[in-house]
Structure formats: C-alpha cells, structure tokens
C-alpha cells in the first residue's frame, strides 16, 4: 500500500513514440520541438534508426492519432514518407511522481514504484538502477553478516533526495518546453 503514500502526480502527458528506419542523415543531436501546435522530440539513436516522440492532446483520438497516415503528417516537416520505414509505435504516459517513503519496516520501493518522471533528462531507468544497486549490496551485507537494520535504514536517506532531484528537474524541463512552445515572446518565459 505504498502507492497511497506517493506525492501527487503533477505532470501527466501522453506521447506517441515512433521508431523509424531512416537512411538519410539527420544529425547526431537530440532536438526538442517546441511547436505550439504539438510538442515533440527527435532522438538520433544508432544509425540508421531514429526516434520521434509527439505529445498527444486530450482531445486526440488515440487510434486515429497513431495511424500511419497521421504519423506521415507528424513527420512531414522533416521527412518524406519514402525516406523512412516505421518499425514501431507505442503510446506512453509520462508522470511526475515521488513516493514519500522509500522504505517502511522490511518493505522497500525501487525504480518506478518509488519514482516516475518525464523523460526529459533521460534518467528514469538509471535512477531505478541506482536504487537497485544501493539496496542490493546492503541486503547482501545484512544477510551475510547479520548487521540488523542500521545499514538498511540508510536506503531512504541515500536515495530519495537524488530521485527527488531527477523528478523535479525532469518536470521543470518539460514545463519549460511547454512554456517556450506557447509563448509569443521568449522573454516572457520565467527563468525558473
């Protein structure tokens, strides 16, 4: 029942993730597309593969939105349909959630059970791996040397602040992208 101790989910967005086979050179930099009509991301994974993500609006019909015809429209500013092959498409929901407690008695939360964040820092999976690494050696040492709870109690102290940093900053980057996409004057976007 740890879910009930989680902080509120202040950032919920759906995106479509589209993986393509593209022979055309598109550069080696990830690009955030701050288009007021539809925010998106371009990620140049290992050649010849490319990844595009586009925000799904609340009033979009998911089936229609994820159709190949609509994907062609989404990609049309950058690619012609004969320049790519769609390999995969998936709908994801991004969250910004941080559990208030990562441990209680002998129950521990790691990874997505403890924290979820938008992907804008690219740290979601690695934050979960750091949780697992931090907790696993403590459990092994406790089991091997019967150290009691003292070592295991440090898990919350050592991991929650780091996870909070990732969640809050990922959220901040997402909100900043939205602010840039929806402003007429860049100087109107707050510095923080």
What is each stretch, according to the model?
Residues 8, 30-33, 99:
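Short Gly/Pro-enriched turn/cap motifs at secondary-structure boundaries
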Residues 35-91, 188:
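Conserved FAD/dinucleotide-binding core of flavoprotein oxidoreductases
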Residues 14-41:
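Flavin-dependent oxidoreductases
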Residues 1-11:
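Single conserved hydrophobic/aromatic residue that forms the stacking wall/gate
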Residues 186-192:
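Long, low-complexity segments enriched in small/aliphatic residues
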Residues 4, 22, 26, 59-62, ...:
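Short, polar/flexible loop-turn hinges at active-site or ligand-entry regions and domain interfaces
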Residues 86, 92-172, 179:
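Conserved mid-domain beta->alpha element of the FAD-binding
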Residues 1, 71, 135-136:
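Structural preference for long, well-ordered alpha-helical segments in enzyme cores
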